[in-house]
Structure formats: C-alpha cells, structure tokens
Amino acid sequence: MEVLMAERANLVFHNKVIDGTAIKRLISRLIDHFGMAYTSHILDQVKTLGFQQATATSISLGIDDLLTIPSKGWLVQDAEQQSLILEKHHHYGNVHAVEKLRQSIEIWYATSEYLRQEMNPNFRMTDPFNPVHMMSFSGARGNASQVHQLVGMRGLMSDPQGQMIDLPIQSNLREGLSLTEYIISCYGARKGVVDTAVRQSDAGYLTRRLVEVVQHIVVRRTDCGTIRGISVSPRNKSRMMSERIFIQTLIGRVLADDIYIGSRCVAFRNQDLGIGLVNRFITFGTQPISIRTPFTCRSTSWICRLCYGRSPTHGDLVELGEAVGIIAGQSIGEPGTQLTLRTFHTGGVFTGGTAEHVRAPYNGKIKFNEDLVHSTRTRHGHPAFLCYIDLSVIIESEDIIHSVTIPPKSFLLVQNDQYVESEQVIAEIREGTYTFQFKERVRKYIYSDSEGGMHWSTDVSHAPEFTYSNVHLLPKTSHLWILSGGSCGSSLILFSIHKDQDQMNIPFLSVERKSISSLSVNNDQVSQKFFSSDFSDKKILIPNYSELNGIVGTSHYNFIYSAIFHENSDLLAKRRRNRFLIPFQSIQEQEQEKEFIPHSGISVEIPINGIFRRNSIFAFFDDPRYRRKSSGILKYGTLKADSIIQKEDMIEYRGVQKFKTKYEMKVDRFFFIPEEVHILPESSAIMVENYSIIGVDTRITLNIRSQVGGLIRVERKKKRIELKIFSGDIHFPDKTDKISRHSGILIPPGRGKTNSKESKIVKNWIYVQRITPTKKKFFVLVRPVATYEIADSINLATLFPKDLFREKDNIQLRVFNYILYGNGKPTRGISDTSIQLVRTCLVLNWDQDNKNSSLEEVRAFFVEVNTKGLIRDFIRIGLVKSHISYIRKRNNPSSEKKEGSDHSMNPFYSISPKAGILHQSLRQNHGTIRMFLNRNRNPILLILSSSNCFRIGPFNHVKYHNVINQSIKKKTSNYIKNCRAPYGTAIQILIFIHFAFTKLINQISCIKYLHLQTSNVFFPVIHSYLIDENGRIFNLDPYSNLVLNPFKLNWYFLHQNYNNNYCEETSTIISLGQFFCENVCIAKKEPYLKSGQVLIVQRDSVVIRSAKPYLATPGAKVHGHYREILYEGDTLVTFIYEKSRSGDITQGLPKVEQVLEVRSIDSISLNLEKRIKGWNRCITRILGIPWGFLIGAELTIVQSRISLVNKIKQVYRSQGVQIHNRHIEIIVRQITSKVLVSEEGMSNVFLPGELIGLLRAERTGRALEEAICYRAVLLGITRASLNTQSFISEASFQETARVLAKAALRGRIDWLKGLKENVVLGGVIPPGPGSQRIGALSTATYQHSFGKNKNYLIRGRYERYFILPQGILCLFYQIQNLPFLELH
C-alpha cells in the first residue's frame, strides 16, 4: 500500500481538455504499462465517469447555441461577385457552359469548405463550452458536416442520382431557407430515405441474381487434380501490390506449386497458407507464388476443397457438401444492401475536390523553359501552359532566387518573364485520380436561347460525323453564332411568290408556326393554295385557271406552269442529300398506250432551295431495258465518250453517296461482260482454290453457293477478299495465235477462233481474256458478251407532256442519254439490287442575258390548284432576277423613276441623297425576307426586322485607311447593278460617276490571299452597304449610282487627346460581315457593342445584327447545318466531359451491377467485350484457326476474369468493405465459363452459335480427336442464369413459359444436380447429407488420359501443353509478364 502511495505521489496531474487522438495515445500507454486486462478496467471507470458527468451537466442544444460564423457574410459576397464575373464571361462567349459549371462548382465548394474550417476555431475563441461545439468536436453527437449546415451554409446539393445542382444554398438552417432554397434542399434532404427504399430493392434483386447463378456450386471433392495456378507477386513491375493486399490475397489459399528459396523447398504443393508462411514469403522475397483458385478448378458444376481453400468461418479447409456458391452470392449482395444506409445523414450535400494552387512567395520575375510546356486551356477556360514532366520555375527578385518544381500534368498560369506579386497563383496542380475512384463521361446539351440562323467559322468541320446526319465535329476552339431573326415557320412559303430579299410588312406573315401546315419530305402529300400579291395596298389575288393542262403565264410573273402531274396524282417527295426526288405515281388511263413509257420510272430532281444552275438535271428516267441483275464489266464499241464533269457545257451530276461521273453516249452500241463477284471479309474460310473450275451451286464458303459455273479468281485486298467467277470456255492456243496475246479483246461474230486442235466460227460477240496462273503457263478464257444497241432518240412525248417543252424566258429542256459507267469500269450490285447502265436525263438550260449584268436563276416550285373541285399539282419553273432593283420593279413598275416613292423598301433606313439626312431609322413595321432551311430541312422564311438590329454611331474623327480625296466628274446613264460573289473575290469596276472619290495608295489584301492592285483605280466614298446571308453585298441607296468596294470596307477611328496634343490611332477595324462579342469597345468614348454581325456600314455609323455567341471546344458536337434555322430550345451543341462520381455506395452499387451484367460502364473504362474480340482476332491470326481459337479463348477468359475481379473489389474497397476474392471469383467463374461455337471449321457435335462450357468443349475435342472452333464470350449474371444445365432452375428465375417450351421442343433432361431444382421438386438438396447421393449419380473420378509426368496443361507460369494424335505441340505462355494477370 505504501508503495502505491509513493508511486501516486510521483505522478503528474494533467488538467486539460483532450481529444480523440490524445485518448488513443493514453490507451496505448496504459496497455504497454499495465496490460490489456487492467487497461479495460480503467477504461470502464472512465466511461462511468463520463456518463455521470454528462448526466449531471445535462448538456442540451438550443437554437441560441447555433452561432453563425462572422466571416460568412463577406465570403458569400465574394463568391457571388466571382459568379457574376463568370456569368458575364459566359455571356460574352469567353467560356462555354461546361467551363462555367466547373468553375461555379469550385467557387461555392471552396467557400463552403472555408466556412467549415473556420467553424471550430471560431467556437474555440468565442465560446469553447458551447454545446454544439462540444458535441461535434468530441464526436459524441453529430459531425462537422452536420454542424456546418446548422451554422455555416448548406452549399451545393446533390440530387438522388448523384448529380450536382449548380444553384448553391447560401443560407444555413439557423438562418432559415428561402422558398427556392427549400425546394432545392428537398432534393438532397430526402436522399437518404430515397436510397434506403429504392437502393434497398436494387441490392436485394442483385443478391437474388447472384445466388441464382451460383446456387448449384457445392464442394463435392477434395482434389480435382488440376495443376493450373494464378501467379501472385508483390513486386510486379507495372503495379506494386501493397503488403496488406498481398497478405489478404494469400491467406486461406492452397499452393499450386512448390515454393523454393534458393535450393530449399519451404512450401509444398496443395499446402494451405497461413499468416506465418505468408510472412516468411514477404521476408525472404521469394519468386511469384502460384496459388489455386476457383478459376483453376477442372470441375464443371461443382468445386473441390483445395481450389476453394479455407473456410472463413472456422479457418480450416472447407467441408464437403458446403454450398459455397450461395455463400458467395450473399457475401457480395448483402454488403450492397447494408451500404445503402451509409449516407452519414448529410442530407445529400455535395462533396468534391479542388485543385491545389502554387503561389509565389514574394514579388519577382518568372523564368522557365518554354520548350517543356505548350499552351492549352484550363478546365475553367483560362489560358495556361501544360507541362508533361517536372518543370523547374525560378522566381527572381532583387536579392533572392527561388526555385519551385511543378509536377507533371499541371497548369502554369503565368508567362515567361512575367512579373508576379507575392501570394499570386502561378500554377495549378490537379489532385491525383486516387481522390475519386469513379469517373464518368457526361454529355451536356446546350440549347439555343433565341431564334435565328446558325453560323459558324471555318473551324467547324463541315463533313458530318455520320452520313446523312446533322452532327458536325469541332476540331478546335471556336464560336458558334445564332443570328437573330423572327421566323415565319411555314415550309410552304418557299412555293409562294415571296422571294429572297423581298421587302414586306412584317404583320403580313406574322403567323403562328403551329397554324401553318408543313411539307414533309417523307412521302406526305403536298397541299398549298397558290396566291399572289404585288406588295402594295391591293388585295391578294387568286388566279382563275380555265384550262387544266394549259400554260398559265402573265406578264407580271413570267413563270411557266406545266401540268406535269395528272389527275389525282399524289406528289411524293424523297430526301436525297440536298435535293428532292419526286417519282411519278400515276398517269391518266387514256394515255397508257404501248408506245408510252410507264411514268413510274420517271423521277424529277429539284434542289431543296428550288434554285437550278445552268445545265443541271431536272428529271431522269431509267430504262428497264438497260438494267442488269448481275455484276460485270462495261466495254464501249468506240472510244467516243466524254466525261460530263470535264466538259463545261455538260452536266455535273450529284449522286446519293458520292459524285458519280456520267459519260455522254456517242456510240450506237456497248457491251456488258457478266461475271459473278463476291466480296468477303478477310477472315472468311474459302472452300475453293484460285484458278480452279467449279460448277453451278458449288459451295464457296459456309453460307455462299455459286450461281454460275466457271473459272475462280481470288484476289486478296486490304481487309477483304474479292472472289470472281468467270463463265465461258477455256482454250489452250498455239504460240502462233496472235489474238490470245492480248489481255482482253472483243471479237465480232463471224471471225474464226483457231487453237491447236479445232477451228470455230463465232456467231455472237465474245470477249477473249488471257489468264496466266504461272509465268510459264497460260490459257485463254472465252467469255460471253451481252450486246446493247442504242435505239433511236426517245420521243419527248413519251416522257413528258408537250406543254412542258414550250419555251418561255429562253428556258430550254433537252433529252440526253448517258452511260453511268466508264469504259472498262466494273459494275457491282449490292445485295439483290439491279444495276442501271444507261440513264435518260432531262437537262435544263437557258440563254444568259448579256445586256443585263444581274444574275438570272431558274426556280422551281410546287403548287396545288383547286379548280371546280379538281385538285391539280403543278411544277412552276421560271427565271428570276435576284437583285433589289428587280424587286422594286416587280412591286410597282410605274414608280420606277419617282424619287421618294419607295422609301419603305429598306427595313433599316431610307436615305435621300439631296437632303442627306436619315428620314427613317430602323423601321419597326418592315422586314427583309431571308430564305433558309430549318432543323427538319423544310424551307422556311426568316424575317429580319429592325427589332433584330441596333445602330451605333455617329462616330467622330473618322478617317479612311490609306486613302486621299480626289474629285472626278463623269457622266453615266445606267444604274450600277449589285454584284454577288464569294468572300475574297476582287470585283471588276464597271462605271465611275460624279462623286467624291478616294484614291487608294496601297494595295488592299483581300480575304483568301487574293490581292487587288489598286494603285490607279478610283473608288467612291460609300454611304452604306448591306450584307446578307448569301454573301451578297448591296448598296442600299436606291437613288445613287455607287460602285461598291466589297469585302474590305475598313474604318480606323482617331480620337483627339487634348491634354497631350496628339492623335491616338486605335487598331480596331470594322468590316462587313465581321462578328463582335459583347462588351468589345471599338473606339474610346464610344458605346460598347453588343454581340452581333456588322450588317451595314455607313459613313459615320454601323448597323449590327444581334447575335448570340456560343463558345465550343474541341470534341464538341454541333447539331445542325450551316445557316440552318434554329428555334428557341433547339439543341445546339453537345459537350462531352469527365465528371467525378459521388463516393457513396448509391453510385457504386449500380457499377457493381453493370460489371456483373457485363454492360459498358462508361466510355473511359476499358470495354471487356472489345478486348475479348481483339484477343480472339490477334491470336487467331498469329497461330492459325484451330490452335488460335483454343489458346485465344483460354487466355481471353483468364484476362477478363481477373479484370472483373479487380473492378468489383475496387468498388467495395472504396467503401471500406472487405470481401474475400474467392467469393467474387466463384461468381465471375460462372459468367465467363461459356464459349460460343463459331462457324469456322465444321463440327459434328455442336451447332454454330451454341453456348457451351469451356471445359466441355475441350473434353469433347479430345474425345473426338477433332478441333472444335469457338471463341470466348462474356455473359451477364442474368444471361448466365438462363443458360444453365437445369431448365427447372431457368424457368423458376425468368421467362417461365419460353424456357419450358424450348426445353420441351428440344427434349432436354434435367439431372437435378443443383439446389434450386431439388427444392422445387421436393427432393434431397445437394448440400450437406445430400451431397453424397448427388456425387454417386455423377461420373466417377475423372481419370486423365495422360500420365502425371506428362499431362501438365498449365504448370508454374501458366505453361500450356496441347497433345495431338500426331505428336506433341508445346506452347508456352509466360503470363507473369502480362500486367493484367494479377489478383488484388
């Protein structure tokens, strides 16, 4: 007693608050000093003391104890300011939606995390005995995240799917939530309840499927006799395995081979491993250890004790009769059921990670090697440099040189030689991938905010990603523009009298889009009432047609109306790239005479925009007489055939898939040499030899038979095999035969063909072809020829009514015959389609009016006229002049020479040259029609009115760039016409007039590197210009004859600085068609521009059409075509970016399900099915078909098994759940144990496409001494459950009727080896006592057919021996060098 009192006197009394870490240290010291038993007694006393003090203190939580952090106000205000700046940058087009989303998340996440970190220091300083602080800080009740929501801010919330809601909740629960914040909070607040209900059912269903697939796996034998093994090594070069994982992998396993340290054997084969033996392996660093796993067991429907290993319950080898399959299924499924509750009651608050910043320690200049970095764009849209290796950055100040090493894949946010201040961020280091175990590729769709036409720069790839789609890929960062305009959503407007560039009152077509019927190109009937208007105050006129089939023409419109379509004929339109294809459906009965060609074969081809070019095809007819069903070669009788594309006065024909050259017929006959052609894949098994002779209906491949007999020619090309069959006679000529020396020649009838034995008079045309199998051996093949005679020119009346060819406005329609294939070109038919050799085309042409410099174009429109109850369809064709003066003439011809009578023609302004003032600025009730196509490729009108444009100016101190003034007087009597040309074209100056001219001193460099030498050319000072979507630039002063200087009208703005007495010249240049982003100042003391395109440039002001920019980065997909009309809400761009998944099991559990069902998890992770196909293909190509299939399937299955095990382990390990590998291996073994019988190689046992077990296929092949070709497949747990040996088990799982019906038809036998089928039928179940009876029914112990010293299938490093009847073929595979063969 005295000794204890003396020891107590020497003890030091500590009176301070301790935390959890200090308590752990105290307990550790107590155990070392007093032992385990006495320490537990001391801790019981501490626990009792704690409860007593807590009861006496009665700590409770009141609302007054929730104290808001004082720094929250300015932190939230700073975050709001950053978000506002970010929103402006997004509106200006500097960052796109994904970059804005990322930066917004990190701004608010950083703010929330800073508030959480300030929480405890604030309580410690202001109120250390606050109940909230004591509870959360000690961990007795609640945690930091929950208290943070009470006194800090709730922050960003997650929805039930784990996606982040980008609107943060700035309030905390103490302050109260607004209505909007409460609604957003409800998404996350119920997250735990939703997970408990919904995910619980998902986890339960997963457990049921897992048990279903392995319910028949029972331990039935002690040793299966296998010598296969999986190599496990902690010192793998590709990936170092941690010691903890290495121990967990080995404990409880059984060795597949002896283990040596030097020459001493330390462990024997079939010895189970304990912790002591594993520690010796780690200490001595032995070679890689080969262990037995469920993967290596040779059984098909059971497992042996040694391959399973120790039982986790008692630590010894598993007992016979134990249902290890059901245990494995529950071991994997049950943790998922429990882990749905692991939400920690945080209310769905989003948790993520931010980047680590490197800051400058003091002021100085940055120095680094520019060769080691390259410019890039950060994930927030900021310019930066990316380094791939360690980069040394030096900061030089006046007296200190500091060096900072930037790790690889980091962003450098400063430039070389840049001066930085102290604490300035100079680099951004992204956190490693270990922070977020799961990443997914997410698609974010950007929708149009306004209505208008889509324009893009040349950076957008105009070629669609897929054929006939409207998706375009973006190769680099650029802007997409939506030019504003109010659309009149009717596809029928194209067929009315309104033309492009017409001036009109806006209320005239201000019709709701839904109330106007639309034209569908998918075989819908076209219906439209034809009307006209003169754009004046007159009423709308409806013409009255007296003759149904006559030509209707007026002096006002100058159009041809031809009754091409007959009574009750339906107009069916078919999309064909950028044109309509309209086949004729019916004709009048009285016209169906013999000499008439059926109209069903005639197709009218009209561009979607309705505009024809000169010498373009209007219609075509395919004569069935020139149609073949077989492939062959075309030969001309003469060589007088011209390529149409090469001749200027001929036709350029645009085909469906590609440009196809046509050849004008100048011969009276041509020849067709038939041949049978088969295009086969590279891996096809051909059953005939090259240069062999076969008969009709001979098997060429497994599924293809020949249609004709003849000579076989096999040509192996890139990734395909071309097999040809030449029919005809074979001759062996003498050396004196001159004809046989030619490689291919046509011989007319009547000419003798002589060989060494006989002579023969040829009655028909033949084709002689020299065949040379070898250098010294040749023969001649005489092939039959089909001769086609060209008949007389087809009568036009047999194709179209005579009224169509009445010429008006110089429009001419002519018929031409064209051969679709060149001389000697092969013709190939696809599937059962026929091949058209000759096409009859109707060509549209007209004479260009040289007196008028305006462009003329032919437009075609569809109209439907209802006269006396009869509905007639018409095609209207006519010449149209496409400039403004023509429109004014068409509107009111009598007011052509009156001044001021047409001021309302321009929607933007009207200028009087005499007064020189702006009469009318941006009229609200007028608009200009633009013709476009909407998303459905239907024609539509876009009305550009003053509400879509804004005017800036007038500008002061404007001077022209590189010009001097000079006055020239010259009379003219003609109006200067408007010109149309692509961007960058130098326009020829036609007329000079009396005006103030400017002489250009230097040459102007036009776009596309075209230079215009203008040293002696005079241009006027233009008042204004207008550019439209078609690239035409107009001078909008209708009463002045001004020569326009297109495509390079630039302005420089000079501003006087009165303080310094000098002129400062800015570098801003304004050009027609130029795009401006918002908030770009073109000149000092001038208003900031809104985003848009320069539409009109005046002397002292510009008119800009409003436009919204959308920034897009490489890899984005643009939906829609150039100049396509988009409505508000239409999909514009799709961004694809990587996103970190939430770390809870609610996202991990579906991932486990996706892995077990063998579905593609995401586009970032490797797709196992693609890897399997790649392995099968590579191994087969290297080793040949028989051995390639066997070895390829075996190695592919091993690879996929270990990859699946690692993926499932990774999901559960991230949640802190440890599942032994053997449970996962039993499940994976079942979904990877099937192979698919392939078609290559004949088999008398299994059918092609049949699913069989891998071991069964190997044993059957050895028993029959016949190679069975198969390839590995991955089955999900659902498919594996429906492909078992028991149809009773399958029927009790899913699709009961289908399974039982198929089993009855096939006569399947169920041997009742599994647990489930015996439960269903009330028999003795296999596990436990029933295992002995089931084992007796099975075959006796399998005796291997080879000796133990020779029968190694896989030994040590997975070495595989294959034994053939003819001999032994040894193929060694050193699997330990492959990084994927590794168990974690």
Curated annotation (Swiss-Prot):
User: Any idea where this protein resides?
Assistant: Plastid, Chloroplast
Originating species: Sinapis alba (White mustard)
Q: Which GO terms describe its biological process?
A: DNA-templated transcription
Q: Name one GO cellular component term.
A: DNA-directed RNA polymerase complex
**How, per the record, is the cofactor bound?**
Binds 1 Zn(2+) ion per subunit.
Give the E.C. number(s).
2.7.7.6
Q: How does it assemble?
A: In plastids the minimal PEP RNA polymerase catalytic core is composed of four subunits: alpha, beta, beta', and beta''. When a (nuclear-encoded) sigma factor is associated with the core the holoenzyme is formed, which can initiate transcription.
Reported function: DNA-dependent RNA polymerase catalyzes the transcription of DNA into RNA using the four ribonucleoside triphosphates as substrates.
- Residues that coordinate or bind Zn(2+): C224, C297, C304, C307
Show the PANTHER family listed in the entry: DNA-DIRECTED RNA POLYMERASE SUBUNIT BETA
Alphabetized Pfam families for the sequence: RNA_pol_Rpb1_4, RNA_pol_Rpb1_5
- GO molecular function: any one? DNA-directed RNA polymerase activity
Per the annotation, which location comes first and is thus the protein's main one? plastid
By its UniProt entry, which NCBIfam families does this protein fall under?
A: rpoC2_cyan (TIGR02388)
Q: Which cofactor does it need?
A: Zn(2+)
Q: Which UniProt keywords apply?
A: Chloroplast, DNA-directed RNA polymerase, Metal-binding, Nucleotidyltransferase, Plastid, Transcription, Transferase, Zinc
**Protein family according to the UniProt entry:** Belongs to the RNA polymerase beta' chain family. RpoC2 subfamily.
Signal peptide per UniProt: none
**Catalysed reaction per UniProt?**
RNA(n) + a ribonucleoside 5'-triphosphate = RNA(n+1) + diphosphate
Q: Is Ion transport one of the keywords UniProt gives this record?
A: no
Gene3D superfamilies listed in its UniProt record: 1.10.132.30, 1.10.150.390, 1.10.1790.20, RNA polymerase Rpb1, domain 3
Q: Any idea what this protein is called?
A: DNA-directed RNA polymerase subunit beta''
